[in-house]
Amino acid sequence: MTDKSNNPAPASDPSTTETSNDADGSDGQLDAETDPGTSTGPSDLDDVILDNLDAGSDDPSDEASRGLFDDLLEGEPIFENKEVLRPSYTPHKLPHREEQINNMATILVTALRGDTPSNILIYGKTGTGKTASAKFVSEELETTSQKYEVPCEVEYINCEVTDTQYRVLAQLANKFIDKNAQLIDDRIAELEELQSQARENTAALEETAFGSLDDVEAEIESLEADKSEFEEVPMTGWPTDRVYSSFFDAVDYHERVVVIMLDEIDKLVEKSGDDTLYNLSRMNSELENSRVSIMGISNDLKFTDFLDPRVKSSLGEEEIVFPPYDANQLRDILQARSDVAFKGDALTEDVIPLCAAFAAQEHGDARRALDLLRTAGELAERDQTDNVLEDHVRQAQEKIELDRVVEVVRTLPTQSKIVLFAIILLEKNGVHNINTGEVFNIYKNLCEEIDADILTQRRVTDLISELDMLGIVNAVVVSKGRYGRTKEISLSVPTEETEAVLLSDSRLGDIDDVQPFVQARFDN
């Protein structure tokens, strides 16, 4: 990516070319002490900083004046543009997704003819390129619509964040209200310019639809009245039908085809049911000027099982499945991104294959592969080494896995945390082959200590199964002969780190002495 500035490179290095972003995507500008008449691009900034560091005087007092970051800046940066390794980045080319992209384009091309595209459901596991591909196609659609002057817009909603009908409709309403306001302002500006020209020469109106200056003024007043009718929707407080009405009026203000992209659409259905999808999928029968199409993206291939048959029928007109990437495909993706993300030969030859291999084990997750590569690069920078090594990748794998565990444990419900804490206490005190009864005894005492409700042993068994599904514990059903069957439970995550996360919860952190609860195992 090149800098749009036309200023020359610094005189000290006329061969230097400029790039728009440094490793962290910032604009990197020099202060006034450099050369006030010269614009220095971000790619030059690293060199200037290093030159300034190396050019310090021999005065011993300089050592004392060195700041916290001076030593860290002395090493050569590894990254050229770290942002291309983040999930938010949409590349200009998506390897191994050509078929899915072409399928989407074939369906959406009807929007460029002014017709309503079929609704699309996109399925695939995390990190299979669903959202990136959909955004790429959407950007191409909007670019082409501008080229041919066909009004076509795509609006993106992340349903993991915007997960209720009210929030979805309010966010959409406000987006279209803002667009309408901008459209009206632009039109008024054009009419005011026409007014100005017509006052000097009435011939300016001859090739327009206006017969007089009064007609122009009337049109301006009409537009201002339209704008005043659009009221921004608050994120809470209105009846849902009023929010829907605001969205409906805003989207139908003028002719256009609108594609509403609902990412993580299953989260919306899980939280709020299918009312939102029902309303969106049926509104075309009432719209007069605009047409609406839905593009839903989901990690769950079975979420439509919970939909009303009418919604399922209209929503799933077209389905596109994104299969997991294999190791070779992940290697291609990483290679393409690394060429832009890293400087020179920063990566040793075994780094990309190892990142690809680790991610292939995680159901072909490209997002995981990119996170691994970025984290490995960050670890190498912290080590102040010139290269990213295989060891950095292995450290990154451990760090990402630990971060995942910490986040999962941190967001567990309180009862699940108590059950997990009971298992940790048993393991820390040397108890092997932990069974459900032992966990339940410790659990009861913990609940009494923090004044929490005590669930039944059957419900605690269910919570253990849920922890097993999350990969936090390993619970195996074993037969005890005439004594029946039981679950043998063990931790699948680091004990110390997991305990620290649990104790950060204010309720569990109030427990002063855990030893009596472990002793309860032998007393019950």
Curated annotation (Swiss-Prot):
Q: Which domain of life is it from?
A: Archaea
Question: Which residue intervals make up region (Disordered)?
Answer: 1-67
Where ATP binds, per the record, is at: 128-132, 325, 337
Give start-end ranges for the coiled-coil region(s).
none
Region forming the signal peptide? none
Q: Which SUPFAM superfamilies does UniProt cross-reference here?
A: P-loop containing nucleoside triphosphate hydrolases, Winged helix' DNA-binding domain
NAD among keywords: no
One of the entry's Gene Ontology molecular-function terms is:
ATP hydrolysis activity
Keyword match Nucleotide-binding = yes
Gene Ontology BP terms: DNA replication
Keyword list (alphabetical) reads: ATP-binding, DNA replication, Nucleotide-binding
Which residues fall in a compositionally biased region of kind Polar residues?
1-23
Function noted in UniProt: Involved in regulation of DNA replication.
Write down the PANTHER family for this protein, in alphabetical order: CELL DIVISION CONTROL PROTEIN 6-RELATED, ORC1-TYPE DNA REPLICATION PROTEIN
Family the UniProt entry places it in: Belongs to the CDC6/cdc18 family.
Protein name, per record? ORC1-type DNA replication protein 4
To which species is this protein native?
Answer: Haloarcula marismortui (strain ATCC 43049 / DSM 3752 / JCM 8966 / VKM B-1809)
